Amino acid sequence: MEMTLRWYGSKFDTVTLKQIRQIPGVTGVITTLYDTAPGEVWSRERIKEMKDEVEKSGLHVSGIESVNVHDAIKVGTSDRDKYIDNYIETLENLGKEDIHLVCYNFMPVFDWTRSELARKRPDGSTVLAYNQDDIDKIVPEKMFESISKDMNGTVMPGWEPERMEKVKELFEMYKDVDDEKLFENLKYFLERIMPVGCFLVSARYHAAAVSCVSHGRITVYPGILLKAAKCSIG
């Protein structure tokens, strides 16, 4: 087991790599290219630039969270293969730069969700929190407005202002995507990326093999994943 810390990049994180380096036992960071839109290919040059910045601090890039999945893939539109091809190329480039762990999610519209971004603990510290009852009281179209008041300048993955400006379009886009359809599209996606991304290493991709880890809130149970993609998970 390795101790790591999430790092949002020098442009977006108030915590510096120098500060992270001082935490006992922490040897790496989990990060991403926060200024790269879902669906775009991550070039080896950009990946190396990110790695070099981290390694100069005495840490290393332990993994990526996330290479975001384009909405066309989740919804299953006619152009999804273009974005899946871009995703595969990104995984290959990460592997060639010696980064072999990628976390992704397949959650619709809002990416990951919290009901509070700064719940106060008894010791005075603050933490993220999730309460389904609170979420149920929020009108979906107003969720960004409700949550953003506590962001304090932080840009949450999947909650970028330019994305949330189109929240009504996103709801329209996903209106016919029920649980079954979402899992069908997940199956299609996993079967496409598995040769490079899900523990199955072919000769073509051997040098760039990458392990992909699905975010838990996708609500994928082991049996469903095994059925969907024949991907062995622990």
Predicted regions and their residues:
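Conserved beta-strand edge residues that scaffold enzyme active sites
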Residues: 34-35, 68, 108-109
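Active-site-adjacent substrate/metal-binding segments within catalytic domains
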Residues: 62-71, 77
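Active-site acidic/histidine proton-transfer and metal-coordination neighborhood
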Residues: 11, 73-234
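A short beta-strand-loop structural module common to alpha/beta enzyme folds
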Residues: 27-37
